Every structure is written in structure tokens, then in C-alpha cells.
């Protein structure tokens, strides 16, 4: 016999075979097993399924108490005695004192004190001990397993009750479900993650299987899209499936991706599970005021984040900066925030210690955003977010020009979602637009050197329309937009932008800017096939002494590009230019410059009959460039490398018609047909 407090049969479980086996194994060897996880992840469903199987195999009963919705006075202790169905007078009379012994001060029934004040009733150890003994005896006779379900609103009270029960009977088995652990030494915690949407390329995961039980297996790509938008949350999937009564699956996929499932509603056994909003609101009500503010302000962060970024966004007059880290950990403990990277890790490239990183799941983020908007704080939080991203971009720019460019690349990759949001969210005013433009300009190396040219141009073209005031920042943005246009072989657009940038640089007496403009013109002329004009522009750029080495390609890069331009024409001058490039470097960790210099040497040696030396230089250039990216350059080097290997093995190949076409136009091995594509996002 299984005594469920709500008398419902245990439900079926989808996609929890591993967790089911894990909980079953722990239940056989440990007295206390706690299932934790975010709201709606399926903790109660799995616990009931495991206990149903456990009692079917081993006999016995299950005493379930729904701590969130099933308590009607007296707390979990009295509810547990009621679930046991005790008719014994001693048990009934001692239930209330036991409840008082395990209750938080001020939670249980209050008694009047002097001057009309209220106080907690005095504990009654003898009666409490009697009730515990009676309950323990009942559990031994019936071989009962206790299930304290949804303990969050009375978690401390449940922890004291569990501790007393295990002291009374160490052989007792107790299963707890809550958004956070009880924190007892005897406790073994199983944390439930959302269901996987896919298990590999083309393989649907359990989240899709769960949705397909309602929709059928038609249009699997739409099922995957819906489950990805819902982040694999079982409750969100169930509520979304209920919407199919009033809309088609394609409509559901479009709506859930744009609007989110926060206010989807459907039938449920508890009020908390009738919508994601209700589920999140229940947890929000249990948080302290500080934790609520931090939760709401974190909702402006679209991606994962570290404590520094969280502090920038959340700290204010009502939330001290020192309090943010503690709030993050408390929110993580109750499964509002996910920790996606533990603290204490080591950067694989630099060996530097890595901070933890967190993530706010979509349901919690949508709920927090609604609370932020209701409190009238959304505008201020968004402004703080963009300012923090501007600081991140500036830090990345300095790291790029410093001793290790990989640090800059990793920083931008880690903060990709946040930087993208800071660049694309509509600015609130002119000052906010300048902040977004500053981010785009600071990330010049990401666009120009790491292969994201198309994205960079799109951001700059849009933001330049919003920032019309003639400032030094706008002058840099104009140069960068023209430089990217030249790299993408858009000569007309590049010419117009660089002309405007030249006027602004003259107005601001920016000699560094004039040198960068000459460098960009050289790129334009090289891709246009006018080597003489490119050499002239690069010679002008190399005569300049940079005053600001922290922005843009400096004289060293102009020397390296000059070596590439001269490689097929004048070997001695090309070698000299490559040497000057490395001599005038700003940092030994400039892999962008190093790979360009090596590639120039490879082209020079190849053009002047030294294929073996060219092969060595080309291979080193490829390895250096791989450290920072840029697929077009990498593809070009690989193409050159393949030709050099063929030459070394078999001698020079007979020329063909295609040899007259530059590699960036015809494409090397594995390159798309269109020129200067942008690097694909990881996992896309």
C-alpha cells in the first residue's frame, strides 16, 4: 500500500532514466535524499515515480506531505502525522507540540504576551518526543518512506523535523524535494537539470519526446525549435502544449520564440504550476528584498555572466556592491540562478584563475524583467548594463594590444551574448547611443582581425546613423567602417566612408587616424589589383609614428602589409619590410602581426624560388593565426600551403586559367563562394 497525501497515482516520467537510477541507488544506501532544481523541472514527478517503484519492489508505504500547498496549520510535523493516519490519541495530542518544536520562530501559531505582544509558544520536549517515537514506530511497522514534497516555504522547519526523525530512527528513509538542499550532513543531493533538447546532430532529446506525446512526431524541426525556446523545462513544455488547443504548432513556435512562455496557462494539480509566472512568483515571494532586486536586475543580462558584471548591473543605493555576491549564491542555492562554471578553474591558454559564471534561465529572466519593469527600474538597469559592456570592450581592446591577444579573444567569446545585446538593443537617448558606438569601436580587432567583418559593419552602419555629432569617437567609427568595407571588397562604400573619416581626422588633428586611413586605402587598392597605389599608401602609413598604440593597426601592421604587396615584385624590399614590421611591434604577443609577417615571408620566398623556406613560414603563419581566428585568412594560408606542398613534392605546377584569380576571390579549400564571410558562432 502507498499512502499518498493527495491520493493520486504516481505519474510517468520522460527523460529521467539516469536520475531515476541515481535516486533509487541513493535511497537504498542513505537515509536522506533531496531532489533539487528550478521551478517546474520535475522534482516531485521523479520523486513519486522512484518511490512508487521502490515500494513495488520492497513493499512498504509512502507518507507524502505537500509542504507548499498541503499544510493546514501545525506545519510539516502535524501534516506528516495526519498523512500517517494515526488514530492513537497520544500521537494526535503530541502533534501540536512537535510542530512547535520544529517551527521557525514567528511562523507557527502565536500566543498573546505582555502589553499585547505576541510570542512563540513554549516547546514541550516530552510531548514532542512521544510524537516522534510514535511516528518512528509507525514507520518501522509499515516500512514507510517519508516524502516531504516542495519544502521551500518551510525548509528550515523541515530540516529540523528531518534531523529529529533520523535521531529517533536512523533506519528511516526520507526523500525531500525543494529548490534548494536542506543542508544536513546526512543529505545526498540530486540536482535535476532541464531536459536535453537534442542528444546529438539529428537526434531528438527527451524534451522533444515530451512535447511529441501531445503533438505527435510531425514537423520535428518545429518541436526542436519550441523546446529550445523553452530551454527544456518540463513545466514550460507542458504549458506550451496546452496552447495547441488554440493555435497551430508553427504559430506556437513563432510566438514562444518572440514573446516567451511566461504567461502560458494550463490545468495543474497546484496553483504554482498553472503558469510559469505563478511558479516563479512563488519562489520570488520567499526571497529577501535584496535578493529580489538582484534577481530583477539580472534579467537585463541575456547571456551568462561573472560576479563583476552582475555587480555592475545590480549594485545601487539599495543594494551594496558587497551584497551582490551573497545574493548570487543564495539565488543559486534555490535554483533561480544556474552556475555554468565553477570558481577556481584555470584558463587553458594563460593559466589565469577564472571566476565563476552564472546564468539566469529564460523563465526566471522573463519574470525578473516583468518585476523590473513594474518597479520602474528597467531603463536604469539597461543603461548600467551598456556602460558595463563598454568597460568590457575597452578591457578587451587593451588586452589585444598587450602581451597576449588570446585573452582578448576569450574575453569577447565569453561575453559574446552580452556584447551583442549591448550593441543591438535600441539606445534610450543620444548618450546611450554613443555608449553603444564606443563598444563597436573598441571591438575593432574582433571585427577586423578575428573574422567578424560583416557583423561589425552592420553595427557600425546602424550606430553611425544614430550618432551624428562630430566627435573623435565618430571619426574612429567612420575609419573602422571604411576599413571593414575595404576588407569585404566594397570599394565604393569604403571610399565614401574613408573620405568622411579623413575630413573628421583633419578636423580633430588626428595624425594616427590619417595613418590608419592610408592603411585602409592600401587594403582597398590591394583587393582592387592596384599594387602600386597600395604600396604608395602603405609607405605613407609607415612613415607615421603612432601616438596611440592601443587602437587600430599601427605602423608595424602597415610594414607587414607592405611586405605582402612587395612579395611578388621585389624580394629584398619585401624581406626588409617584414623585418621592420617585427622590429616595430608593440608587443611580443601580437599574433595578428606575427602571422601576417610570416605569411609575407612565405609569399616572398615562394615568389623567388625558395618553396621549402616558404612552406615552413606558411605553416608557422597558419598556427599563429589559428590562435586568434579569421577563417578567410586561415583558408587563404591553407590554400597557399597546399600549393607549396605540391611544389616541394612535384615541382611547380603548370599554370592554368584560375591562377590569374586571387585566392580571396576564387576561395581556397573549404571556403564559401562569397568573399570575406564572417566567422561562424560556436555551435551554430
Question: Which residues are covered by each model-predicted region?
Answer:
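Alpha-helical sensor/transducer elements of the RecA-like P-loop NTPase core
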Residues: 4, 16-18, 45-46, 75-82, ...
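C-terminal boundary/linker of central alpha/beta nucleotide-binding cores
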Residues: 44-51, 162, 280-383, 387, ...
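Conserved adenine-nucleotide phosphate-binding loops and their immediately adjacent elements
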Residues: 1-25
Amino acid at each position: 500500500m502507498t499512502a499518498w497525501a493527495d491520493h493520486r497515482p504516481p505519474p510517468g516520467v520522460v527523460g529521467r532514466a539516469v536520475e531515476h537510477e541515481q535516486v533509487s541507488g541513493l535511497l537504498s544506501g542513505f537515509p536522506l535524499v533531496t531532489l533539487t532544481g528550478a521551478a517546474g523541472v520535475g522534482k516531485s514527478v521523479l520523486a513519486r515515480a522512484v518511490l512508487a517503484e521502490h515500494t513495488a519492489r520492497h513493499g512498504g508505504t509512502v507518507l507524502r506531505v505537500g509542504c507548499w500547498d498541503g499544510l493546514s496549520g501545525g506545519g510539516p510535523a502535524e501534516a506528516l502525522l495526519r498523512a500517517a493516519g494515526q488514530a492513537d490519541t497520544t500521537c494526535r495530542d503530541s502533534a501540536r507540540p512537535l510542530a512547535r518544536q520544529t517551527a521557525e520562530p514567528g511562523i507557527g501559531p502565536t500566543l498573546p504576551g505582555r502589553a499585547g505582544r505576541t510570542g512563540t509558544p513554549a516547546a514541550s520536549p516530552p510531548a514532542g518526543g512521544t510524537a516522534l517515537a510514535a511516528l518512528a514506530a509507525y514507520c518501522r511497522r509499515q516500512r514507510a518512506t517519508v516524502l516531504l514534497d516542495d519544502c521551500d516555504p518551510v525548509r528550515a522547519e523541515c530540516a529540523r523535523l528531518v534531523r529529529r526523525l533520523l535521531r529517533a530512527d536512523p533506519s528511516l528513509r526520507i526523500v525531500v524535494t525543494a529548490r534548494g538542499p536542506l543542508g544536513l550532513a546526512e543529505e545526498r543531493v540530486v540536482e535535476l537539470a532541464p531536459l536535453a533538447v537534442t542528444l546529438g546532430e539529428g537526434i531528438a532529446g527527451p524534451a522533444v519526446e515530451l512535447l511529441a506525446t501531445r503533438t505527435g512526431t510531425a514537423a520535428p524541426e518545429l518541436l526542436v525549435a519550441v523546446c529550445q525556446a523553452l530551454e527544456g523545462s518540463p513545466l514550460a513544455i507542458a504549458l506550451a502544449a496546452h496552447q495547441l488547443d488554440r493555435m497551430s504548432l508553427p504559430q506556437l513556435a513563432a510566438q514562444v520564440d518572440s514573446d516567451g512562455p511566461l504567461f502560458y496557462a494550463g490545468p495543474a494539480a497546484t496553483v504554482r504550476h498553472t503558469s510559469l509566472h505563478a511558479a516563479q512568483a512563488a519562489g520570488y515571494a520567499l526571497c529577501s528584498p535584496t535578493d529580489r532586486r538582484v534577481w530583477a536586475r539580472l534579467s537585463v543580462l541575456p547571456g551568462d555572466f561573472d560576479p563583476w558584471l552582475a555587480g555592475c548591473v545590480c549594485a545601487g543605493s539599495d543594494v551594496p556592491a558587497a551584497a551582490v555576491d551573497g545574493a548570487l549564491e543564495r539565488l543559486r542555492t534555490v535554483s533561480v540562478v544556474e552556475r555554468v562554471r565553477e570558481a577556481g578553474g584555470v584558463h587553458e591558454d594563460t593559466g589565469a584563475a577564472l571566476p565563476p559564471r552564472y546564468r539566469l534561465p529564460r523563465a526566471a529572466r522573463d519574470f525578473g524583467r516583468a518585476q523590473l519593469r513594474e518597479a520602474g527600474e528597467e531603463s536604469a538597469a539597461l543603461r548600467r548594463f551598456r556602460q558595463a559592456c563598454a568597460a568590457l570592450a575597452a578591457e578587451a581592446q587593451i588586452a589585444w594590444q598587450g602581451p597576449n591577444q588570446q585573452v582578448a579573444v576569450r574575453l569577447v567569446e565569453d561575453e559574446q551574448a552580452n556584447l551583442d545585446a549591448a550593441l543591438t538593443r535600441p539606445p534610450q537617448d543620444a548618450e546611450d547611443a554613443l555608449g553603444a558606438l564606443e563598444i563597436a569601436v573598441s571591438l575593432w580587432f574582433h571585427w577586423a582581425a578575428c573574422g567578424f567583418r560583416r557583423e561589425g559593419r552592420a553595427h557600425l552602419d546602424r550606430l553611425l546613423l544614430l550618432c551624428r555629432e562630430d566627435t573623435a569617437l565618430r571619426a574612429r567609427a567612420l575609419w573602422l567602417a571604411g576599413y571593414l568595407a575595404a576588407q569585404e571588397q566594397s570599394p565604393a562604400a569604403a571610399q565614401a566612408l574613408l573620405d568622411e573619416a579623413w575630413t573628421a581626422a583633419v578636423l580633430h588633428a588626428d595624425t594616427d587616424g590619417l595613418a590608419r586611413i592610408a592603411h585602409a586605402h592600401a587594403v582597398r587598392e590591394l583587393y582592387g589589383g592596384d599594387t602600386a597605389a597600395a604600396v604608395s599608401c602603405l609607405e605613407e602609413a609607415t612613415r607615421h609614428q603612432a601616438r596611440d598604440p592601443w587602437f587600430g593597426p599601427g605602423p608595424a601592421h602597415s610594414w607587414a602589409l607592405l611586405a605582402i604587396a612587395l612579395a611578388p615584385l621585389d624580394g629584398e624590399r619585401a624581406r626588409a619590410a617584414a623585418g621592420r614590421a617585427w622590429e616595430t611591434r608593440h608587443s611580443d604577443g601580437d599574433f595578428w602581426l606575427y602571422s601576417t609577417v610570416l605569411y609575407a615571408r612565405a609569399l616572398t620566398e615562394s615568389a623567388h624560388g625558395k618553396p621549402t623556406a616558404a612552406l615552413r613560414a606558411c605553416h608557422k603563419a597558419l598556427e599563429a593565426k589559428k590562435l586568434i581566428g579569421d577563417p578567410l585568412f586561415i583558408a587563404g594560408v591553407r590554400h597557399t600551403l597546399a600549393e607549396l606542398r605540391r611544389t616541394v613534392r612535384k615541382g611547380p605546377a603548370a599554370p592554368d586559367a584560375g591562377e590569374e584569380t586571387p585566392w580571396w576571390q576564387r576561395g581556397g579549400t573549404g571556403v564559401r563562394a562569397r568573399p570575406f564571410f564572417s566567422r561562424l558562432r560556436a555551435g551554430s
